[in-house]
Design a protein with these regions (language model features):
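A short glycine-rich, His/Asp/Glu-containing loop-to-beta-strand
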Residues: 21-57
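Short acidic-glycine-tyrosine-enriched beta hairpin
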Residues: 40, 76-96
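Glycine- and acidic-residue-biased ligand/ion/polar-headgroup-sensing regions
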Residues: 51-54, 60-76, 84
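Short beta-strand His + acidic residue motifs that chelate non-heme Fe in jelly-roll/DSBH
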Residues: 56-59, 77, 95-101
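Ligand-binding loop in jelly-roll beta-barrel domains
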Residues: 93-117
């Protein structure tokens, strides 16, 4: 029986929550924080926390990005993504994720190259943000 599908807590949920609580979330922009989980070469896995109504700056990708929504929802030029949905993006997609006003959003994102932002000011601080 699938406990998660039945809406029950997984026995690992507490373990994962405790492990994440010991790590430091880094602010990226107002309403946006990240927690880098793993890095290997250019590949990075991170969690993003986005407050309700947060707009991520317009960007494309230098490589591939896979994003899975763990909580909440966001919309962009590709559609609306809610809990359990996965977005697969590459350099052919330019988008601006916008979080639903109804609640916050937590997403797991794995990239194999840095993002490419359109706004020059964001590009200027991008190395400092590690994104």
């Amino acid at each position: 029986r699938n406990r998660a599908a039945a809406g029950e807590d997984s026995p690992r949920r507490g373990y994962v929550a405790d492990a994440l609580a010991k790590r430091r979330w880094s602010p990226v922009a107002p309403g946006l924080r990240q927690l880098v989980l793993a890095e290997s070469g250019a590949m990075t896995a991170r969690l993003f926390y986005l407050a309700p109504g947060t707009r991520v700056p317009v960007h494309t990708h230098r490589g591939q990005e896979l994003t899975m929504v763990l909580h909440g929802a966001y919309s962009d030029e590709c559609g609306t993504f809610a809990r359990g949905d996965v977005a697969e993006l590459d350099d052919a997609v330019t988008h601006q994720p916008v979080v639903s006003q109804e609640g916050d959003c937590v997403a797991l994102a794995v990239t194999d190259a840095p993002l490419r932002f359109r706004n020059w000011a964001v590009r200027l601080v991008q190395p400092l943000l590690g994104i």
